[in-house]
Amino acid sequence: MEAVLGPGPRICEGDCAVLKRDDVFKAVPVLRRRKIIFEKQWFYLDNAIGHTYGTTFEVTSGGNLQPKQEVEESTTETKEAGTDNRNIVDDGKSQKLTHDDIKALKDKGIKGQEIVQQLIENSTTFRDKTEFAQDKYIKKKKKKYEAVITIVKPSTRILSTMYYAREPGKINHLRYDTLAQMLTLGNIRAGNKMIVMETCAGLVLGAVMERMGGYGSIIQMYPGGGPVRAATSCFGFPKPFFDNLHEFPLSKVDSLLSGTFSTETLPSEPEDNVLVEEESNGLTDEKQISLQEIEEESTTETAMEINQTEEQDTMDINAEDVEFKENKEKENKDNVREKQRKQWERRKKLIETAALLTQKNADGLIVASKFHPTPLLLSLLEFVAPSRPFVVYCQYKEPLLECYTKLRERGGVINLKLSETWLRNYQVLPDRSHPKLTMSGGGGYLLSGITVVLDKGKSDSSHLQALKMEEPSSKRCKVQDLHC
């Protein structure tokens, strides 16, 4: 069976991997001789390169990683355990090993599993504990003394869990089950043309890219000077995934909808060449002038044989100055060309993205930002084709209620639904399965719906009716009296 399936993906240098220890995750790049600090342990990932993802390693002396050998626990051996813990007194004297003794064991190179066994043997109350209490004690000591980590491949589930546990504020407290609901309600699939507006460090964008698998196109709307893709880089997507990833600033959406969108005149490549030629001509002129000066100095040198050594030193210094000046001007010229090339490429991509948006045939819209969702959604829905889903995430319910009301007044959408996901973890163990005492207070709210063709006449009449409803009752009575 293994020969048919083959080994899984292997850890390569330059990959982005996720370190896992119990329920703690950390995303790190896989580089040689780079010190990694994780859960109060430091180590190097050199020995992990070449192993398959999902391998569990043990940190040895010198920060090296070694694959952990699986030890089969004997089930035939019966454990000696007490009936209850009523006779156990927590006086701090039950453990015979001191802190210095444990440190000495570590200095001798004894591994964590052996240290745990020593702690069990030197505990005076371990045999009196119940079987459940003994398992809990062993688990606690293993977590403290066993330096074991697992390297896993990044995915939407792992990265969303990591961000929600470590830095929930960076992803607007977007819980992993809520993100899964967004991908489902948005009908994310390969070949789609999606619009994504998010301020979750690129986590939602990476989840959409992973679901689409590199097929289709994604237009990322961003505020400010540029998009933030810190979490997207942790996925480790190949370069072809980014070929169909476009970006467009939110500040230009209104001008694009009104038809006044325009960019500055693009610098063409011939203009760059002309500029380079002018700079190169200037450099040749300066070279000729400097060479003439050197020739004049050489003639005076022959005339004045007494100061021959001093003139030679002066000529060498001038030649070095000219060479340094030429190199510096060449670097400046290269920097100018590179800057112009990047500006030209950026404007070219901006025009291509604007052309994609003006087609107004996007297959879906995902919004998960820290800004108020109503103006964002009303503007971006103009680029979505009819009969396509849209999903809006917000940490709070009130902004989505206002957005729900505005959409009902505007029209052009059906199947509007405001929902909240409820998540609770369970401990599943023999004879002690129960809900965990701690659970998440909330994972945010989702507003979803489907676009339809907007009836302009109906929307205008509903707008007038809304204005009438906003008029004071006294004013409406006066108008009716005048008509009478």
Regions found by a protein language model. Give the residues of each.
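Intrinsically disordered, low-complexity glycine/charged-rich regulatory or linker segments
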Residues: 1-170, 174, 180, 212-216, ...
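C-terminal substrate-binding/active-site "lid" region of AdoMet-derived donor-dependent transferases
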Residues: 2-6, 225-229, 377-448
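Glycine-rich helix-loop-beta junction characteristic of Rossmann-like nucleotide cofactor-binding loops
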Residues: 184-189, 358
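Conserved class I S-adenosyl-L-methionine
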Residues: 189-202, 206-209, 215-225
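Short glycine-dipeptide loop
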Residues: 190-191, 214-215, 384-390
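Acidic, Ser/Thr-rich peripheral helices and adjacent loops at domain boundaries
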Residues: 230-279, 337, 409-410
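A short acidic, Gly/Pro-enriched loop at the edge of an enzyme's catalytic core
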Residues: 252-260, 268-269, 273, 329-365
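A short SAM/SAH-binding and catalytic strip from SAM-dependent methyltransferases
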Residues: 362-375, 394
